[in-house]
C-alpha cells in the first residue's frame, strides 16, 4: 500500500498538447535517440514525457560542456512555473551552442515534439561528437600519466641503448666528417665560373671529380642509345675528344692545386696564439721574431704580387673604416635604445597614472550616484535639516579658521608690542629717562597698557573656548542625527529583508510539507501494519479452530456463523475507509478549486501591479513635462 497520489501537477492548468499519432511517433523517436546516446533515465516508466525530454536535453547540453542552471535529478513533476523556467533556461543555452534550429519555451512546455525532435537530434549528435573528442583526450592523458609513472620493457631497453647509440653516432660523425686538406692563397685570383669554384672547394677537401668528363660520358651514353651500332668513325672521334677533355681537366686541376697550400704547412705558420704559447723565450725575443716574420711575409707578398698588395691594403682600409662606422652606428643604436627604454618607462608610468586617475574618477562617479540614489530615497525633511546642519558645521569651521588666523595675527602684534615695550623699558631707557628728568608716571601708563592687553587676551581666549564648546555641541548633535538616520533602514535594505524573509518562508514551507508527507507515510504504514497483524491473527485462529470445528455439525455451524460475522465486520470497516476516502477526495477537490481561484487572483494581482507601474511611469513622464513647461 503506497501513498495516495493526486492528479499530476496537483490540479494546475495544463497546456493543451497535440495528442495525435505524429506527436507520439516523434516522442518515441526522441526517447530512442536519448537512450542510444546514453541517457538511460528515459526508460523509466514512472517519469512524465516532459521530465524525460527536458532531462535528456539538459544531459546533452551538460555533456557538450555547457552549463544549465537546473536540477532535474531530485525534482520531478514540477509546477507550471518551474516548467516554464526550465524551458527558458534551456532555450537560452541553445544560441550559445550555435544550434541551427529554432525553439521556443512554450513549445517545450507544451510538449510540441514535432519541433523538439530536430533540436534533440542535433543535441544528441553534438553530444556523441563531444564524447569522442573527450574520449581521445582522456585516452592520451591516461597514456601520458601512465608513461610518467610506469614504463614498458621496450622503453627500458631503448633507454639503455640510447646513450650508447648516441655516442656511436657522434663518434662516426667525428671520424667521417669532411676535413680540409688544402687552402687557397690569400692573394690568389678569384674564380669567376661556378664549376671552377666547385672544383676548388672539392679539391680543398681532397676530392677530385671530373664533372666535364662525367657530363661528356653521359652525352656519349645518350648518343650510343640514339645512334645505331657499327659507326666506328664516330666512336674514334668521341674517344679522341674524351682524351682531350681528360687532359684539359687534369691541367685545370693542377693549375688549381698550384694556388693552394697544404693545411699542415698553413698550420705551421706563426700566429699570435702560437707565439703566446711559446715557452722559455723572453718577451723581447718574441717581439723580434714576430717583427722579422712580418717583414719577410710582406717582402714575399710584395715579390709575388705587387699590384695585388695595393688592392689588399685598400680593401683592408675600407674594412677598417666600415668597422668604425659600424661601431659608431652600434653606439648610436644603443643610445637610441636607452632613450627608447626611458621614454617607454615614462610612458608606462604616465599610462598607469592615467589608469589610476580614471579608476578613481569612476569610483567617485559611482559614489556620487549611490549618494544621489540614497538622497532620493531618504526623507526630504530630514535630508534638508541634515544639509542645513552640515552647512552650519562648515560655516562654523570656516569661522573658526578665520578666528584662529585673526587671533594669531593679534597675538603676533601684541607680542611685538610687548617686545617694543620691553625694549623701551631697558636700563638704558631708564637712565635716559631719569637723566632727562621725566616724571615716573610714564612707567605707570606703560604697565597699565600691559594689563589692558592681558585682559583683552584673556577675554579673546575665553571667547575662543566658548566657540569651541558650541562647535563641540553642534558636532555632537550632528553625530546623533547621523546615527538616527543610519538606524532607519533604506528601501534597498527593506527589500533585501523582504527577500530573505520570503526565502526563509519558502524553506520553512518546504520543510513543513516534507515533514507532513513523512507523517502521512508513517500513519499509512502503521495502519497497514495493524491490518496485516489483524489478518495474520485471524488466519491463525481459523487454522487452529478449523479441524475442531469440522468435527461435528453444530461446531461447524457455529464456526460458519463466526466467519460470517467476521466478514461483515470487515465489510463495515471497508465501508468506513471508503467513506473516509471519499471525504478526503472531496476535500482535495475543494482545496484544488481554492488553489485555482488563488492562482487566478495572483495572476490578476500581477497584471494589476504591472498596469499600475505603467500608469505610474506615464504619470511621472507627464509630471516631468509639466514641470519642464512651467520652468
From Swiss-Prot:
Chain spans, region Sufficient for interaction with WASHC2C: 448-631
Write the record's keywords in alphabetical order, separated by commas: Coiled coil, Endosome, Phosphoprotein, Protein transport, Transport
List compositional bias (Basic and acidic residues) regions by residue number.
215-225, 421-433
Q: Where is this region: Sufficient for interaction with CCDC22?
A: 1-430
Q: Which residues form a coiled coil?
A: 309-631
Where would one find the signal peptide in this protein? none
InterPro entries, per database record: CCDC93 (IPR039116), CCDC93_CC (IPR019159), CCDC93_N (IPR048747)
Q: For this chain's UniProt record, which GO biological process terms are given? A: endocytic recycling; Golgi to plasma membrane transport; protein transport
One short Pfam name that applies is: CCDC93_N
The listed locations are: Early endosome
Region of interest: Disordered:
1-23, 214-243, 421-447
Q: Which GO terms describe its cellular component?
A: early endosome; intracellular membrane-bounded organelle
Q: Which residues carry this modification: Phosphoserine?
A: 298, 301, 305
**Quaternary structure and interacting proteins, as annotated:** Component of the commander complex consisting of the CCC subcomplex and the retriever subcomplex. Component of the CCC (COMMD/CCDC22/CCDC93) subcomplex consisting of COMMD1, COMMD2, COMMD3, COMMD4, COMMD5, COMMD6, COMMD7, COMMD8, COMMD9, COMMD10, CCDC22 and CCDC93. Forms a coiled-coil heterodimer with CCDC22; this heterodimer interacts with the guanine nucleotide exchange factor DENND10; the interaction is direct. Interacts with WASHC1. Interacts directly with WASHC2C. Interacts with SNX17 and SNX31.
Q: Explain the purpose of this protein.
A: Component of the commander complex that is essential for endosomal recycling of transmembrane cargos; the commander complex is composed of composed of the CCC subcomplex and the retriever subcomplex. Component of the CCC complex, which is involved in the regulation of endosomal recycling of surface proteins, including integrins, signaling receptor and channels. The CCC complex associates with SNX17, retriever and WASH complexes to prevent lysosomal degradation and promote cell surface recycling of numerous cargos such as integrins ITGA5:ITGB1.
What family does the Swiss-Prot or TrEMBL record give for this protein?
A: Belongs to the CCDC93 family.
By what name is this protein known? Coiled-coil domain-containing protein 93
This protein's encoding gene = CCDC93
Amino acid at each position: 500500500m503506497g501513498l495516495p497520489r493526486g492528479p499530476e501537477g496537483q490540479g494546475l492548468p495544463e497546456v493543451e498538447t497535440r495528442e495525435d499519432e505524429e506527436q507520439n511517433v516523434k516522442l518515441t523517436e526522441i526517447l530512442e535517440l536519448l537512450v542510444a546516446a546514453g541517457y538511460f533515465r528515459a526508460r523509466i516508466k514512472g517519469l512524465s514525457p516532459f521530465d524525460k525530454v527536458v532531462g535528456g536535453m539538459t544531459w546533452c547540453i551538460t555533456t557538450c560542456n555547457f552549463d544549465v542552471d537546473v536540477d532535474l535529478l531530485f525534482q520531478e513533476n514540477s509546477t507550471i512555473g518551474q516548467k516554464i523556467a526550465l524551458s527558458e533556461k534551456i532555450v537560452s543555452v541553445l544560441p550559445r551552442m550555435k544550434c541551427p534550429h529554432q525553439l521556443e519555451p512554450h513549445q517545450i512546455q507544451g510538449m510540441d515534439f514535432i519541433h523538439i525532435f530536430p533540436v534533440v537530434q542535433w543535441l544528441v549528435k553534438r553530444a556523441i561528437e563531444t564524447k569522442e573528442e573527450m574520449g581521445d583526450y582522456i585516452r592520451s592523458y591516461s597514456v601520458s600519466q601512465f608513461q610518467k609513472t610506469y614504463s614498458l620493457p621496450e622503453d627500458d631497453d631503448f633507454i639503455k641503448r640510447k646513450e650508447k647509440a648516441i655516442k656511436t653516432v657522434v663518434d662516426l660523425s667525428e671520424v667521417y666528417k669532411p676535413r680540409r686538406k688544402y687552402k687557397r692563397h690569400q692573394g690568389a685570383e678569384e674564380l669567376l665560373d661556378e664549376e671552377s669554384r666547385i672544383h676548388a672547394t672539392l679539391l680543398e677537401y681532397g676530392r677530385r671529380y671530373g664533372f666535364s668528363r662525367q657530363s661528356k660520358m653521359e652525352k656519349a651514353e645518350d648518343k650510343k642509345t640514339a645512334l645505331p651500332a657499327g659507326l666506328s668513325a664516330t666512336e674514334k672521334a668521341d674517344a679522341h675528344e674524351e682524351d682531350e677533355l681528360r687532359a684539359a681537366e687534369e691541367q685545370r686541376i693542377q693549375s688549381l692545386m698550384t694556388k693552394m697550400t697544404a693545411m699542415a704547412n698553413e698550420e705551421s705558420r706563426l700566429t699570435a696564439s702560437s707565439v703566446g704559447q711559446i715557452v722559455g723565450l723572453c718577451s723581447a725575443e718574441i717581439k723580434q721574431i714576430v717583427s722579422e716574420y712580418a717583414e719577410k711575409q710582406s717582402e714575399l707578398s710584395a715579390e709575388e704580387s705587387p699590384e695585388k698588395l695595393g688592392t689588399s691594403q685598400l680593401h683592408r682600409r675600407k674594412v677598417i673604416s666600415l668597422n668604425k662606422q659600424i661601431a659608431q652606428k652600434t653606439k648610436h643604436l644603443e643610445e637610441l635604445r636607452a632613450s627608447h627604454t626611458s621614454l617607454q618607462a615614462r610612458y608606462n608610468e604616465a599610462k598607469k597614472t592615467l589608469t589610476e586617475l580614471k579608476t578613481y574618477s569612476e569610483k567617485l562617479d559611482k559614489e556620487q550616484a549611490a549618494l544621489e540614489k540614497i538622497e532620493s530615497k531618504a526623507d526630504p525633511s530630514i535630508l534638508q535639516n541634515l544639509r542645513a546642519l552640515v552647512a552650519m558645521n562648515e560655516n562654523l569651521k570656516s569661522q573658526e579658521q578665520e578666528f584662529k588666523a585673526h587671533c594669531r595675527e593679534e597675538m603676533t602684534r601684541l607680542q611685538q608690542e610687548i617686545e617694543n615695550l620691553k625694549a623701551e623699558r631697558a636700563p638704558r631707557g631708564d637712565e635716559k629717562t631719569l637723566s632727562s628728568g621725566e616724571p615716573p608716571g610714564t612707567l605707570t601708563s606703560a604697565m597699565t597698557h600691559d594689563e589692558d592687553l592681558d585682559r583683552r587676551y584673556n577675554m579673546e581666549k575665553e571667547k575662543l573656548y566658548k566657540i569651541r564648546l558650541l562647535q563641540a555641541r553642534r558636532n555632537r548633535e550632528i553625530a546623533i542625527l547621523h546615527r538616527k538616520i543610519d538606524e532607519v533602514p533604506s528601501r534597498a535594505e527593506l527589500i533585501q529583508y523582504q527577500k530573505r524573509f520570503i526565502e526563509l518562508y519558502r524553506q520553512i514551507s518546504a520543510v513543513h510539507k516534507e515533514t507532513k508527507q513523512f507523517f502521512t507515510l508513517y500513519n499509512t504504514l502503521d495502519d497497514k501494519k495493524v491490518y496485516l497483524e489483524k489478518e495474520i491473527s485471524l488466519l491463525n485462529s481459523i487454522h487452529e479452530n478449523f479441524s475442531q470445528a469440522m468435527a461435528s455439525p453444530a461446531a461447524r455451524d457455529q464456526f460458519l456463523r463466526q466467519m460470517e460475522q467476521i466478514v461483515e465486520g470487515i465489510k463495515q470497516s471497508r465501508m468506513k475507509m471508503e467513506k473516509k476516502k471519499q471525504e478526503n477526495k472531496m476535500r482535495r477537490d475543494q482545496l484544488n478549486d481554492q488553489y485555482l481561484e488563488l492562482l487566478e487572483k495572483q495572476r490578476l494581482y500581477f497584471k494589476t501591479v504591472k498596469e499600475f507601474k505603467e500608469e505610474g511611469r506615464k504619470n511621472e513622464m507627464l509630471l516631468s513635462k509639466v514641470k519642464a513647461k512651467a520652468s
